[in-house]
Amino acid sequence: MYLGRILAVGRNSNGSFVAYRVSSRSFPNRTTSIQEERVAVVPVEGHERDVFRNPYIAYNCIRIVGDTAVVSNGSHTDTIADKVALGMNLRDAIGLSLLAMDYEKDELNTPRIAAAINGSEAFIGIVTADGLMVSRVPEETPVYISTYEQTEPAATEFKAGSPEEAAEFILKGGEFAAFTHPVTAAAAFNDGEGWNLATREM
């Protein structure tokens, strides 16, 4: 089954995490690149001009802001992170950003999905052509959401103890292994000593 872009957020016995996966049929020539306190989705070498064909394919997918990790499938990662940095709570930062930026105006009306987590709470959200949803993530029950098919948060058993394991898991572990067209993945993991980042490729 093809889910498009996928993100997961939550806590397990090892710590807190956000994870993100690019699955793509139209623009598979992409990679994830770690920068300072962020991970960017960018075209691979030789395909840089793809951004002129589709403005939605390059963006920061993860941002770290203090004790908070933000993850999304587009430029709203930065909008949410900036609001969190100014002191806005996670629910409102996600909700206002999704409402303002709306779904992507491409041929498929691709939804924008997002999540954020800190030491005390986590929220996940989506905006589609039909509406907006932001909900609290249950404590110790990780959830995931995607741009297609799984457009509501779904509980998942997320087996990871590091950012490397989290990126690997959303790319091809557990139930995620059944989802088609994986390209690249990234994750942030906090084991109590702060956030660390990692990426994985197919």
From Swiss-Prot:
It is an enzyme of class 3 (hydrolase). Pathway: Purine metabolism; IMP biosynthesis via de novo pathway; IMP from 5-formamido-1-(5-phospho-D-ribosyl)imidazole-4-carboxamide: step 1/1. It catalyses: IMP + H2O = 5-formamido-1-(5-phospho-D-ribosyl)imidazole-4-carboxamide. The keyword Repeat does not apply. It holds the Pfam family IMP_cyclohyd. GO terms for molecular function: IMP cyclohydrolase activity. The keyword Phosphoprotein does not apply. Keywords: Hydrolase, Purine biosynthesis. Its EC number is 3.5.4.10. One of its GO terms (biological process) is 'de novo' IMP biosynthetic process. Belongs to the archaeal IMP cyclohydrolase family. Catalyzes the cyclization of 5-formylamidoimidazole-4-carboxamide ribonucleotide to IMP. HAMAP family: IMP_cyclohydrol. This is IMP cyclohydrolase. It comes from Methanothermobacter thermautotrophicus (strain ATCC 29096 / DSM 1053 / JCM 10044 / NBRC 100330 / Delta H) (Methanobacterium thermoautotrophicum). The lineage of its organism: Archaea, Methanobacteriati, Methanobacteriota, Methanomada group, Methanobacteria.
